């Protein structure tokens, strides 16, 4: 089963907009209260927190029953990945609706349960969104507020496609900062444009932050969203190209398991830490995984250790083999190649040694 998030804009009037605003405000206030209770009592399972706080929360915040249940689930989900501190939620945080409080009517409208009753909302979407909503099965939805507009991010389920032919072997993909991705066939996707945009955004952000006003804060949020959209678009193009290439070559895809890499970069200098912090490898990997799943291609994750130091011809591993960021020369056999292509070859070889090629994704990539 493939699940995709389809975002559509909601058409509202004064009455329905007020209902959504009130629902969002109460829902997130309830999440904050529930989070405080969960933290103080160390109650992080939804079943246990429900018994402790459901009735009190529903009465205090005047939430419908199912929205109270969803607030409990949202709070507990945040503690699944981080229990080191008490979590807080902004007044415009996403509101989660499931099948009991959200229902599509065709593909152009949806019913939502709010604090002011059940309302029917008209949805504004394009041809691609209409196609996805009509072909898949809708699940839960998130209510979002972005730049003064309300959106629904709807989870749409699609059946698994037939498995593609992978008799051609494996296409290894090395991900990096200078070259965002390099495959074992030698094709690279430069990160120069992304780096230039990030540098411009960082300087712009510095100028805006100096003003310290509410309008500057809103401007800063807009800048961050724009930079994020640009990065996601670049990753979309790269992942689409790689999956299409693998499909044509009848190959499976192999990626590095880079979970925890930012924590290991804590000893780097300030510039390198900034680059690592802005490296959207998880987004690229996630896009490759879901696009490969849509194409019926398996993806395998391999151990990334020493892929850039090991010769893909003779297997000799030495830090000195890596002459520079872009250059690799084996001290044992003299093999010379682009360092990223050599690493991609090693990733390919490790994947081929795996017991089996399965549809696999690393949960840590999406944390």
Where are the regions that the model predicts?
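Nucleic-acid substrate recognition interfaces
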Residues: 1-367
